[in-house]
């Protein structure tokens, strides 16, 4: 069993990070994982448990969700030659897309509805425009919420934004099922 509280985000997502060939983008992902809240390692993907499958709940649920989203985006890239030139950014966005669900300045009981905007802004402010744009639009059509009146997340407009959204959407369906080994790696 994986001890999510005693492993870094970089350790837990090492396989996914290794799928990024571009050293600058890989470094950006690693550096980002060092500055976001460490609790992302052990928190669930959904603080209420309503919006994700069983594998994404409980301790380490968000990490398992990110592993599936990353696998989904890799498969979507393989099936879509038109985005091969954005492979690095799409994989980075899949890894980082939910790393602002539990932001530093907020209570960690519930996930932050504006996490796409927080993540997008962070990436853009660090020179990663494409990754930021992909993260900002990853929630798809769910752009407003009663929990944060007045805030509107970006909706996908470009094809690559839709792919990033679909990778996340599919991994969050309650009927989605997959297995993980004793090291927390996705079993194919």
For each predicted feature, which ranges?
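Acidic/His-rich, divalent-metal-binding segments that scaffold phosphate/diphosphate chemistry
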Residues: 1-107
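Hydrophobic side chains within alpha-helical segments
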Residues: 68, 101, 118-119, 171
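Metal-dependent catalytic cores of enzymes that make or break cyclic nucleotides
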Residues: 106-111, 148, 152
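Short, conserved loop/turn and helix-capping segments at secondary-structure boundaries
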Residues: 110-114, 157
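An active-site-proximal "capping" alpha-helix that borders the catalytic cofactor pocket
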Residues: 69-73, 113-126
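Histidine/acidic-rich helix-loop-helix segments that form or flank divalent-metal centers
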Residues: 90, 123-124, 128-185
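Histidine-centered active-site/metal-ligand motif
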Residues: 65, 97, 115-116, 120, ...
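Short intrinsically disordered terminal tails
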Residues: 1-2, 185-188
């Amino acid at each position: 069993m994986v001890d999510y509280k005693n492993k870094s985000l970089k350790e837990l997502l090492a396989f996914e990070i290794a799928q990024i060939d571009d050293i600058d983008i890989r470094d950006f992902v690693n550096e980002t994982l060092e500055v976001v809240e460490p609790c992302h390692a052990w928190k669930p993907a959904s603080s209420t448990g309503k919006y994700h499958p069983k594998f994404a709940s409980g301790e380490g649920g968000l990490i398992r969700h990110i592993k599936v989203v990353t696998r989904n985006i890799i498969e979507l890239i393989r099936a879509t030659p038109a985005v091969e030139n954005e492979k690095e950014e799409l994989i980075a966005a899949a890894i980082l897309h939910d790393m602002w669900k539990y932001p530093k300045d907020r209570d960690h009981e519930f996930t932050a509805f504006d996490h796409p905007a927080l993540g997008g802004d962070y990436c853009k402010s660090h020179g990663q425009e494409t990754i930021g744009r992909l993260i900002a639009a990853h929630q798809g059509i769910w752009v407003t919420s009663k929990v944060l009146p007045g805030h509107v997340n970006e909706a996908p407009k470009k094809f690559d934004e839709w792919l990033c959204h679909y990778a996340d959407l599919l991994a969050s369906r309650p009927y989605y099922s997959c297995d993980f080994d004793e090291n927390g790696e996705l079993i194919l």
